[in-house]
């Protein structure tokens, strides 16, 4: 089938955008299936001969290909003002998205009051806050699950929308007290936004099935990552949607048999943003080195990312659930200067190995992490263009990961530039 899926395999920020950008050069439709504008992909591409940096949050980053159509699927939650702010910013930089960006009529809506509530919930949690982006994503998905949310199609029946919207806000007042919010002003604002949004709205299920059955190449761009999945991540320090291969099917309305390839994106070390367990975290000079050399600051929030060694327990868990056909190992160049590199291989409790990745966070907080130490290569790989030219120890690191996961690494990121990606031919 003509559907390729790119998914994050750790806690997000793996660098999915660059691979999507490369693959999007040869595809017809780039689709998002879950999440909202809490995601963050940065892509550097030439526009009219000038390198430009584009920050994507809600919109599919495959739009950098001027021949590619973007689709925001029904599994997303959409803050309409942010949708237009991002679209306007891209077009101001010279990226014309006219007649090639569409949004599902079934996608749920995020409102400003969701963002206010998101902040109030974090304050309420105090020292146990999750560390959300405060974009209102969680409260919007909560409304969806409780069947009280509003969807894109509701915008086009203004009287019904206004009635439902007032009830939604009143419900939040009852839960959180009366916070400052102009309900009637918002209703009027969305009346105008609805008319601007109308040309972008489609039946996304019919749209994507027509694309697939007519032979178009479809690329699905996953947001966040497996370890932030609502079911399989480090709950409750997770996002509020399905970030797995299953979320692709439910968020776009396509069956599993239509998916041809699933590519997992793996950072050469591990990072995460916000609270939650992180067994391989390095609160030492190594952690600082990875943070500084890797420029580990969030695209969406600007927050510093926590850093640690590559964790194979996490990746085995991720690979079992998503069934990767191949991997993209990113930011390998960040390890260039290190004389030795550690990889987390097992979690132990009282000397006994845990069989999988534990659901119990108290248990997870008390695991002993077993590491394997590999020799570094201590030379720059940034200008290398073929796999054979990589240093032997670098290839050894790659092979160790492949052998441990039984999944081939097909793409290797060797620098921040768009061209800094080495393709390794897979054995048939």
Curated annotation (Swiss-Prot):
Its cofactor is Mg(2+). IMP binds at residues 13-16, 38-41, 133, 147, 224, 239, 303. The keyword tRNA processing does not apply. The lineage of its organism: Eukaryota, Fungi, Dikarya, Basidiomycota, Agaricomycotina. The active site is at residues 13, 41. This is Adenylosuccinate synthetase 1. It comes from the Eukaryota. Mg(2+) binds at residues 13, 40. Belongs to the adenylosuccinate synthetase family. Signal peptide: none annotated. It holds the Pfam family Adenylsucc_synt. It comes from Laccaria bicolor (strain S238N-H82 / ATCC MYA-4686) (Bicoloured deceiver). Binds 1 Mg(2+) ion per subunit. Transmembrane segments: none annotated. Plays an important role in the de novo pathway and in the salvage pathway of purine nucleotide biosynthesis. Catalyzes the first committed step in the biosynthesis of AMP from IMP.
């Amino acid at each position: 089938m003509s559907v390729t899926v790119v998914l994050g395999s750790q806690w997000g920020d793996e660098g999915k955008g660059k691979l999507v950008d490369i693959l999007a050069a040869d595809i017809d439709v780039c689709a998002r299936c879950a999440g909202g504008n809490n995601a963050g992909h940065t892509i550097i591409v030439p526009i009219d001969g000038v390198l430009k940096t584009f920050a994507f949050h809600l919109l599919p980053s495959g739009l950098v290909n001027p021949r590619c159509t973007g689709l925001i699927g029904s599994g997303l939650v959409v803050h309409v003002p942010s949708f237009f702010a991002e679209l306007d910013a891209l077009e101001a930089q010279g990226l014309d998205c006219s007649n090639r960006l569409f949004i599902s009529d079934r996608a749920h809506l995020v409102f400003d009051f969701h963002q206010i509530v998101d902040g109030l919930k974090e304050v309420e949690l105090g020292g146990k806050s999750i560390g959300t982006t405060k974009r209102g994503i969680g409260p919007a998905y909560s409304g969806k699950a409780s069947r009280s949310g509003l969807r894109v199609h509701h915008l086009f029946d203004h009287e019904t929308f206004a009635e439902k919207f007032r009830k939604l806000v009143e419900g939040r007042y009852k839960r959180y007290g009366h916070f400052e919010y102009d309900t009637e002003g918002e209703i009027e604002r969305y009346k105008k936004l609805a008319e601007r949004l109308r040309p972008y709205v489609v039946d996304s299920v019919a749209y994507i099935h027509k694309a697939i059955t007519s032979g178009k190449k479809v690329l699905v761009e996953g947001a966040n990552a497996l370890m932030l999945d609502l079911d399989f991540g480090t709950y409750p320090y997770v996002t509020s949607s399905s970030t797995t291969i299953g979320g692709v099917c439910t968020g776009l309305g396509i069956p599993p048999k239509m998916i041809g390839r699933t590519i997992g994106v793996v950072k050469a070390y591990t990072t995460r943003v916000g609270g939650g367990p992180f067994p391989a975290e390095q609160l030492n000079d190594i952690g600082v080195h990875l943070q500084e050399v890797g420029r580990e600051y969030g695209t969406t929030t600007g927050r510093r990312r926590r850093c640690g060694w590559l964790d194979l327990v996490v990746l085995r868990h991720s690979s079992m659930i998503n069934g990767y056909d191949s991997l993209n190992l990113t930011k390998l160049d960040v390890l260039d200067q290190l004389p030795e590199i550690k990889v987390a291989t097992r979690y132990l409790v009282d000397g006994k190995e845990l069989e999988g990745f534990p659901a119990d966070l108290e248990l997870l907080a008390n695991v002993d992490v077993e590491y394997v130490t590999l020799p570094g290569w201590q030379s720059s790989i940034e200008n290398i263009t073929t796999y054979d030219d990589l240093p032997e120890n670098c290839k050894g690191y790659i092979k160790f990961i492949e052998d441990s996961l039984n999944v081939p690494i097909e793409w290797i990121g060797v620098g921040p530039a768009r061209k800094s990606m080495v393709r390794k031919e897979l054995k048939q």
